[in-house]
Amino acid sequence: MVSKAKSIALYGLDGIVVEVEADITKLEEKFDIVGLPDTAVKESKDRVRSAIKNTSGNFPYTSITINLAPADVKKEGAYLDLPIAVTILRAVDNKLTRDIGGTIFIGELSLEGKLRPVTGVLPITLCAKKEGYKRIVLPYENAKEASLVSGIEIIPAENLKKVIEFLSGEEIEPYPFTEFVGKTADEYASDLKYVKGQYVARRALEVAVSGGHNMLMVGAPGSGKTMLAKCIPSIIPDMTFEEALETTAIYSVYGALDRKEGVIRKRPFVTPHHTATNIALVGGGQSVKPGLISLAHNGVLYLDEMPEYTRQTLECLRQPLEDGVITVSRAKANIKYPADFMLVASMNPCPCGNYGSATKECKCTDTQIRKYRAKISGPLLDRIDIQVQVDNVEYDQLVAKGDEESSETVRQRVNKARLIQRERFKDDGILCNAQMGERQLAKYCVLSPENDKLMKRSFEALGLSARARSRILKVARTIADLDYSETIEKKHLLEAIGYRSSMLDDM
């Protein structure tokens, strides 16, 4: 007799419906799984056998063949334990008569029949809804995550016994839909009010966050670069529900999701160590998991002491900085993961950190300085919209009483600028100025004849590329938004151009 159940295999963040078939015949005792299973799926034979035996005792010691279709798609992970068990149970027990044609099953089984949580539940649930399935049966610990998806019943089960009761017609109360609420700025520790001075850098940070622009801070050790970067979560806007779904799906596949929380509520702020490998950064490995740049999707990737990373590692950032996605190649296909992040980096001007200082002597040779800065290639630097110098703060300013402007005040301005951008791009499928393409640039970044001449002079004097020009216009548009100006004025353009000219010009 042949029994069937449906599950979903993940391919990156995309799902493919898998039909699990069980054929049980009265031949010699054996248990085979075919259809490109990986090691974890092959090992499910022992887990399923013990789980059924310890739950119902109704395991058929005959010839069992499990087919996972389509046969040309690799199935990875232990999430197929439950649908395999369901097909076997339905084949040998004619009391399990519930119609499961519109149901997806996922879950790992313990030897005693408990359902263990699995990764990738949110993208699996989204795929199930997209494919028209009415419900998904899954481990109870995964229910919170799956409940972010409306329009599909989430049936949580603690063990195989509960699933058997469900298959026999008993009802399990669906898990309620979870309403998304983003986390607000007062939940973060770092606040701009504690950053003394640094008015140029603070302004640059506000502009960068308002438009989602990449930013590089250059300054001596202890000048406040890292402190400024750590204030970004306190001024960055909350995620939309759609952004939270995307981000949560990535963390779910990666296996980094807090199952009690079930959702990523705040924008990611990812800080890779400078020894991180290429695979750790961009993703890959045997199971092709997302990398750290994908974990920073819809948030911030902060590289402290940028030249300490290998040049090869830094060059891996070029494609995602341009496209917002990273393509990870494997033997027979390419898997794409979202990687639309705001890059924020900091560095010293030279190995000793004193180059350009008015009070300390730089002990580096010209060769050492060139070698240090050469870690950051011209094409990568060209993709960084805002480059700002962070000088040391004078003592009197450092000990002055009273707080500086708070993060909450800055955040209010950032939110207003972002609202302008969302309204502007509501029909374009983008959310902020940094995501503009050439069509949006031509429509929303029109310069007056006078400002166009200014742009031309700067283009020629600074030796800018076409990409640099586009990025200057995007930054100028953001500065205009902060001023509530419909047009890009001369002062907006001058400020944007100023962020492209620094001590790094000779790099």
Model regions and ranges:
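Peripheral, non-AAA+ core regions of ATP-driven protein-machinery
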Residues: 1-216, 220-226, 264, 329, ...
